[in-house]
Amino acid sequence: MASELGAGDDGSSTELAKPLYLQYLERALRLDHFLRQTSAIFNRNISSDDSEDGLDDNNPLLPESGDPLIQVKEEPPNSLLGETSGASSSGLLNPYSLNGVLQSESKSDKGNLYNFSKLKKSRKWLKSILLSDESSEADSQSEDNDDEEEELSLSREELHNMLRLHKYKKLHQNKYSKDKELQQYQYYSAGLLSTYDPFYEQQRHLLGPKKKKFKEDKKLKAKLKKVKKKRRRDEEFSSEESPRHHHHQTKVFAKFSHDAPPPGTKKKHLSIEQLNARRRKVWLSIVKKELPKANKQKSSARNLFLTNSRKLAHQCMKEVRRAALQAQKNCKETLPRARRLTKEMLLYWKKYEKVEKEHRKRAEKEALEQRKLDEEMREAKRQQRKLNFLITQTELYAHFMSRKRDMGHDGIQEEILRKLEDSSTQRQIDIGGGVVVNITQEDYDSNHFKAQALKNAENAYHIHQARTRSFDEDAKESRAAALRAADKSGSGFGESYSLANPSIRAGEDIPQPTIFNGKLKGYQLKGMNWLANLYEQGINGILADEMGLGKTVQSIALLAHLAERENIWGPFLIISPASTLNNWHQEFTRFVPKFKVLPYWGNPHDRKVIRRFWSQKTLYTQDAPFHVVITSYQLVVQDVKYFQRVKWQYMVLDEAQALKSSSSVRWKILLQFQCRNRLLLTGTPIQNTMAELWALLHFIMPTLFDSHEEFNEWFSKDIESHAENKSAIDENQLSRLHMILKPFMLRRIKKDVENELSDKIEILTYCQLTSRQKLLYQALKNKISIEDLLQSSMGSTQQAQNTTSSLMNLVMQFRKVCNHPELFERQETWSPFHISLKPYEISKFIYRHGQIRVFNHSRDRWLKVLLSPFAPDYIQQSLFHRKGINEGSCFSFLRFIDVSPAEMANLMLQGLLARWLALFLSLKASYRLHQLRSWAEPDGTSHQSYLRNKDFLLGVDFPLSFPNLCSCPLLKSLVFSSHCKAVSGYSDHVVHQRRSATSSLRCCLLTELPSFLCVASPRVTAVPLDSYCNDRSAEYERGVLKEGGSLAAKQCLLNGAPELATDWLSRRSQFFPEPAGGLLSIRPQNGWSFIRIPGKESLITDSGKLYALDVLLTRLKSQGHRVLIYSQMTRMIDLLEEYMVYRKHTYMRLDGSSKISERRDMVADFQTRNDIFVFLLSTRAGGLGINLTAADTVIFYDSDWNPTVDQQAMDRAHRLGQTKQVTVYRLICKGTIEERILQRAKEKSEIQRMVISGGNFKPDTLKPKEVVSLLLDDEELEKKLRLRQEEKRQQEESNRVKERKRKREKYAEKKKKEDELDGKRRKEGVNLVIPFVPSADNSNLSADGDDSFISVDSAMPSPFSEISISSELHTGSIPPDESSSDMLVIVDDPASSAPQSRATNSPASITGSVSDTVNGISIQEVPAAGRGHSARSRGRPKGSGSTAKGAGKGRSRKSTAGSAAAMAGAKAGAAAASAAAYAAYGYNVSKGISASSPLQTSIVRPAGLADFGPSSASSPLSSPLNKGNNIPGTPKSLHMTSSLASDSLIRKQGKGTNPSGGR
């Protein structure tokens, strides 16, 4: 092969040397010595020491009878590999040496060469091989053969076989390295060549400690010993088979030899000894193996047969025993069955007694409930009269007060007292059944109550007058003492002041006080006169002018009048909400500066300091330390013990609607204060519940109700909810309470008294929900179960109160979504999860020697220098070939673009930075060339004498080339030639004109996506992975890479080019600086940070209301308006604050958390500073008492349930002092719950208007139905109701059909069972009748359900009617279904009332029907009926006589009898309850109650039945064994003698045939 590769084409000696890789390959494949040694070993006879093998002494290496398959070719060494044929005889090695050991060496010397210290049994064969001397002769013989044979070359096929062996070797080496089991043999033979043998240590490390040897291993070793002995014995007897065995061992090596076996190979015959040995071996195997195996099989078959026989015997025994047990069970079943039937009868009668007791209790309970109901009605009537009495008494008191004030006549006193007369003397109640029951009324004397009411009113009036007189006298004495203590004279008023002789008459007009700085309007002056008149008469009042009409000013003017005209300088107590405290203080300071006002608020320490001025000695004069105390409701409750020490001349309660609850602590505390007069100020209409009206009445007239605790008890029962069906009475009482309040209340509205106020315009602004709001709104709506809402709205009153709060929570969720989705679900700041990765460490050795660029150090030289087509030498040779032929050169274009071969090589081989710089330089060159061609002047010649290198560059003249794009402004704005945004598109836009209403449509304008929508951030971020190496050069290289490489590379990355970097450093000194390039010119849409903060634009665009508010505020600010924005939710005000900051609107905020001092300063700043555009207020905190007339626009972001609250809020701007027109905007989301809330607020406003004007009354509480109507649209509610009714109807219909089917199936099943049982009894011939034995414990019951007789002395069954249910139904039937149409028809035959046979076979013949006797039917005895006569009772179908066969069918009707008994008992109980109820009132019932009732029979009982209880022949409560038996009718009356005489006849006929007429 080498000779073929080395042969040249022409055989010349000038051939170049072979490539190095071929030389390396030939040297690596030099295998001659290995092949020679291997062939010598393989061709040597293994058993050469035996003399019987017939070896040839002349040729010891080639046996005579050896197998030629194992002969391996011996090839001479290859001369091309640098060896000669005589290399083996060069004397380097002894030709007769083996493994470097001479043949003459002894075994002891060989043993010193190896380490056999740790050699165990498993490796002893290695020792025998290493110490053997068998290979010396083979080596000498192989050397002789090498000299004799001629040189042979290695064939190609053998080379391929060797390569394949090499491949197999690699494959198995890989398997060895991966398999743990194979790795234990790592030092199997190599350990013998070293001083330390690590084989066993390696094996122990991989396999672990030795496992315990189990018995199986011991057995296996014993078997292995036997096999070895057997093999040894076989080898002794068959020594001739060794060549064949030798052939088998060398089969593995023979397959590498390509010589075919000789065709004529003779088969060797065995000797007799060999055959005997084989025969003996066969017999031994038969005796040792086959015979025990056959014996085992036979014994196992016998055991299996015995086992199966035993199982079969057990099964047969079980079957026989089961049959015997069944027979015994059948024999013993009679007595337990009888006992069971006895127990069932006992349970039946116990159940009967229980049902009877329950019906009796139910009747008593119903009668008791009826009595309770009548008692409640009487109590309600009594309470009604009592309330009428109290209201009449209050009207009389008010009449006395108004008569004194108005000096009127006394003509209406009788009219008031006439209301106590009660014209109704009796009451009729209609009870079911058509019976009218008259209930006697309790005695009521109207004259007595008239006198009592008049007396109480006069006493209360006199007590009030006396209390007022005593208070005035005490105040007079205190004031006189204070005057005497002061060293002053002529203080203005003397001591002659007295309320008994008022100086001002009731009709005289009082002028405005002189100490009041200001001008009162006409209606305000009238209000002050009315208040002064009330004070003179000692009457408390309510000033209820509409908000903004100056209630505060009128109150201050009244106090100034008292100080100026009456010399009453206090002390006055002003109590108001916290939001209006500063307003009261400012108004006092502004209008009456002579008053010393003491603001009582602050922390406990400040209030303690203020209370130092509270001295009783220094009060009541003009020189007192204070005249007026202003405080809040909360502080009054906290410091009540200090306020009760002072006797207040006048107490003014601002926003008096806070006192509407008489059970509150505030109401009770303020009622106990010592004061001469009380004045309540309220701008809202009087509330429309009786309890709230009475609370105001009691507060202004405490003397009238001091002794009447029953009034409180009356309202604590909540009479409105208790008597819902008596609304007419409530309306009458409510109108009377309003009439009582009229003399003590003054109310004016703006449009009636004030024409100077500007108009107020209210505008509803409807907003659309955004997509996010719609999704949230629909999600909330889907979570609501319409059925649950409807069910909760239709529940009881108690359930309605419980569900209203949960429904209101749903309403608040919907309102949050309408206001802003951020209230429901806030968008939080988003940031990815950031982690810091640890740097991975690289060892210094790997860094310096293991990297690819270091490992392949010659790669760059080969690829970039020697083999690269862009090498400068190659480009030069391609352009200038030595033969002068350069037509096919691929680099001929370089001369036309002015690029040298070196520049081309740099572009292609020096990396990306060189190309980038070259591109930058080429763009500059193209720009210069473009300028040169565009602005160069022609030289006058027609053509040039030569062409320049750049004349062939045509790209510069292209219209969209870089120089043209830079120089032309129109080309810069092209789509693909200018810088674009990250995300943009082209859509149509409508452009509106500013000064006209026209608009135009512009198509395909560049549209940028909003920045808050461009959010594409990773979920996890990390610092780029760094490396660390303990090497100085590695750290230097890492630092260079971190800095961006070289300076030029860094400048290109940041600025785009080195020249641009220089310009960037000097940009501040340039007038027109160059735009930045590289990374500095990149501006990401959301910045370089991945943290995403929700934009304020999304805050506006996510809410339809806030978007509408944004547009509205922009317009209002441009027009110079000032705005008040009201909202009920504090979180919504927080969002509005964020919006104001974003839009840069100047604003202020006031809510419930603002302090009192801050509220005063904020209101003052808003009134005085014009730069504040918006005032954010909460509806509850900022809607009371403050003056914000500087604003002319009010915006309600969300509406309140109560329209009065919104009215108060908008009147903060629309009040006295407002000169501009006030515009009120109300933001409403269209199609949502807010529309329905606004509608309800309008309805409520109308109701309040009607109530204050004395109209009808309507409760002011939200019911569940109303809340459900807010949650659902009317159409949706109607649709849901229709669907629900349709589903309910379908469900009822399907249930009815299923019930009918179930009953029919049950009836058919029972019928089938009864027929089967009847047939079985007919076959067995069972027809037993147990004789009648009267007993008291009902023990005469049959065991098998046969005929038995009703004992005479048994308990009387509950009668129901003349025809019982059990006699109507067929045998084994079920209770009748009223909706079923397939039941039996009951025939009422007149002939059935004919005389019947006395001597009938029915056991019930001893009893008779009492109902006919009671109803007046004559009783007579008739002869017995014959065979031809029918023995049917009245109302029974024809052929329904009783037979023994029919009696046998009645034993399976237990449940039917029980249900019949329950129904009959229920009917009887209902009748008894009705009778008992009527009897409780002393009336009898003429009809409507069954004549068989126990009550009726006990009243009208025939004389002939004195010895027997009334028992109906068709009673459903008969014996359960007679259920379904058709019992014929009996005579109307029987005597004891006739019944006893017929006893024997009954017993005789019980065994005979059936009576006539029976089936």
Curated annotation (Swiss-Prot):
The keyword Nucleus applies. Residues 46-88, 213-250, 1285-1319, 1391-1464, 1504-1559 are annotated as: Disordered. Disulfide bonds: none annotated. Signal peptide: none annotated. InterPro entries: DBINO, DEXQc_INO80, Helicase_ATP-bd, Helicase_C-like, INO80/SWR1_helicase, P-loop_NTPase, SNF2-like_sf, SNF2/RAD54-like_C. Residues 523-1559 are annotated as: Assembles INO80 complex module consisting of conserved components INO80B, INO80C, ACTR5, RVBL1, RVBL2. It catalyses: ATP + H2O = ADP + phosphate + H(+). Residues 282-407 form the DBINO domain. Residues 220-232 have a biased composition (Basic residues). PROSITE patterns: DBINO, HELICASE_ATP_BIND_1, HELICASE_CTER. It comes from the Eukaryota. Its EC number is 3.6.4.-. Widely expressed. Residues 1285-1297, 1306-1319 have a biased composition (Basic and acidic residues). GO terms for molecular function: actin binding; alpha-tubulin binding; ATP binding; ATP hydrolysis activity; ATP-dependent activity, acting on DNA; ATP-dependent chromatin remodeler activity; DNA binding. Residues 1-268 are annotated as: Assembles INO80 complex module with putative regulatory components INO80E, INO80F, UCHL5, NFRKB, MCRS1 and IN80D. Transmembrane segments: none annotated. GO terms for biological process: cell division; cellular response to ionizing radiation; chromatin remodeling; DNA-templated transcription; double-strand break repair via homologous recombination; mitotic sister chromatid segregation; positive regulation of cell growth; positive regulation of DNA repair. The DBINO region is involved in binding to DNA. Belongs to the SNF2/RAD54 helicase family. This is Chromatin-remodeling ATPase INO80. It comes from Mus musculus (Mouse).
